[in-house]
Amino acid sequence: MSKTLSFKTYSAKPGDVERKWYVVDAEGQILGRMAAEIAKVLRGKHKPEFTPHIDTGDFIVVTNAEKVALSGKKLDAKAYFSHSQYPGGVKFNHVKDLLRKKPEKVIEHAVWGMLPHNNLGRQLFKKLKVYPGATHPHESQSPIEMKVN
C-alpha cells in the first residue's frame, strides 16, 4: 500500500527558528558571488523551513573585507552614486577609494542590493557583521566557517 502524502505547507514561526553563526573570509573572493551566497544565508533560503515573510536566516561575520576581489576592470571603473536631493548634490564614491577608507561598506552595499528593500530586509541586514581585518569580536558565538565558491 502506498503512503498518503500530506499537502500542507509549513510556515515557520519566529520563535521556532534556530540561528547559527557563520564566518566568511573575504580574502580573494569575488565580491558579487560572495554577496549572493551571504544574502542567501541571511535570508534563510538554505534551510528547508524557509518562509518568505519570516526571518529564518542565520548570522554572518565577514572578515578581511579589505582583501575582497573584484572581477574585470571594476576596481577602476565601478562607482557608487548618491544624491543629497539638493541641486548639484551628486556624489560618486569609487570602489578603489572605498576599499582604502571603509572596506566594509563595499561588502555591505553589495549584500544590501541582494536583500528585499523593506522592513524584513532591514531586519536581515542587521545580522551581517563586516570587519576589515582578520579579527572579529564574535568568537564567543563560536561561528562555523563557511566556504564561498
UniProtKB/Swiss-Prot annotation:
GO function terms (MF aspect): mRNA binding; structural constituent of ribosome
UniProt signal peptide: none
GO cellular component entries: cytosolic large ribosomal subunit
Pfam families: Ribosomal_L13 (PF00572)
Listed InterPro entries: Ribosomal_uL13 (IPR005822), Ribosomal_uL13_bac-type (IPR005823), Ribosomal_uL13_sf (IPR036899)
Tree of life domain: Bacteria
Entry keyword set: Ribonucleoprotein, Ribosomal protein
KW Ribonucleoprotein (keyword) present: yes
GO biological process: negative regulation of translation; translation
Keyword Ribosomal protein: yes
Record's function text: This protein is one of the early assembly proteins of the 50S ribosomal subunit, although it is not seen to bind rRNA by itself. It is important during the early stages of 50S assembly.
Known partners and oligomeric status: Part of the 50S ribosomal subunit.
Family label: Belongs to the universal ribosomal protein uL13 family.
Stored NCBIfam families: rplM_bact
Protein name: Large ribosomal subunit protein uL13
Organism of derivation: Chlorobium phaeovibrioides (strain DSM 265 / 1930)
